[in-house]
Amino acid sequence: MRYLVISLFAVSLLMAGSALVGNAADAAKAPKKAIELKHGTSKRMHVMFNHTTHKDIACEQCHHDSPAPDKPYASCTDNDCHATPGPRERDTMSMFVAYHAKDTDRSCYGCHKKMAAQHPEFTGCRPCHMSQQARKEAAASEKK
């Protein structure tokens, strides 16, 4: 019994270690520059998304469909994943819902809502939707 417990513990450590290595490899593939998400009707509603800021979150949290094991994660609108048109469609396949679903931490809004207690700056729309910080990042990425 003792050897069984020790063996199971060793196997669980190996599995946890390999998961961490996988996340590190995924993080290395992530884009270094901020990405402007242009799915709103107004440029003021665009979002500057920086993968580096979100490096402690597993890629699968947002990119829940990987196109192929050897290919990096696809954009939300690739392969018609969240391509339903219309800014406020209640369809789970709409881009609006992918970003703004309230009751899940798989969406930007849901995750920020969950973390707002530790990070009060996560509340409201402006932290994402072309806030001063987002405008600075947009200007900096255009210069590069």
From Swiss-Prot:
Residues noted as binding heme c 4 in the record, renumbered to the chain: H100, C125, C128, H129
UniProt GO MF annotations: electron transfer activity; heme binding; metal ion binding
Superkingdom classification of source: Bacteria
Binding site for heme c 3: H54, C108, C111, H112
Temperature dependency: Optimum temperature is 51 degrees Celsius.
pH dependence: Optimum pH is 9.5.
Signal peptide extent: 1-24
Name of the protein described by the UniProt record: Cytochrome c3
Organism: Nitratidesulfovibrio vulgaris (strain ATCC 29579 / DSM 644 / CCUG 34227 / NCIMB 8303 / VKM B-1760 / Hildenborough)
